[in-house]
């Protein structure tokens, strides 16, 4: 379980004080896939960095399995938007994936086993010996996902990971995330600016307000577990959920709801 309790983040410098996140509280249950959406610049990335121990909050706390997060916890992995910067171009794909595993007390044989399993999970076994620059953008992001999977995390934090790929690749990667979530039971917190993506991927959508960020709404996504790009996206219920989230984000832009967060079941 991932708990965010009264989280607050203030940036200070050059005589300015900017409150990015204000008294933010929510829970992500173990094995849940939750999407975070909100207006542009609302503090989604700041929140994710605080949750992952990459940025110290000004107030409040984040708990993973009941333990306070004060630095990057061993049970957590990240996938970022800029996959080109997270992969080392001079290292082969398999070596990129293995690199974080060297921090663990694992034999070389075990590391290779985890790398092979992760590559198979993202359908990139044949690319193990390639360099990242030889792969398409979508394939590079699959490598980044494989590296996170090989780490065997309890929680996977994903910060707009598909924003830089084309529409077809994005659809394929969305289906990959849903499949990996079902197969591995990982807790996933997925940040996106795309409303359709949030509704398609998530079992729950958390809508954030404009900065300073609070929870505008938590919405249960009551779509079937089995989803596909053709049928799910044209379903009447998908359209209803998408419209509802869109309306909430528009309200957030106007400043509505910040004093009275709501939950929709």
Model-identified regions with their sequence ranges:
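Conserved ABC transporter NBD signature motif
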Residues: 60-72
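Conserved signature/switch motifs of ABC ATPase nucleotide-binding domains
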Residues: 130-133, 151
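Conserved ABC ATPase "signature" region
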Residues: 102, 109-127, 179
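Helix-to-loop junction immediately C-terminal to a conserved catalytic motif
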Residues: 52
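The feature captures the beta-strand-to-loop junction immediately N-terminal to the Walker
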Residues: 37-39
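Short helical segment in ABC ATPase nucleotide-binding domains corresponding to the A-loop/adjacent helical element
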Residues: 92-102, 112, 116, 220
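Catalytic Walker B motif of ABC-type/P-loop ATPase nucleotide-binding domains
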Residues: 156-159
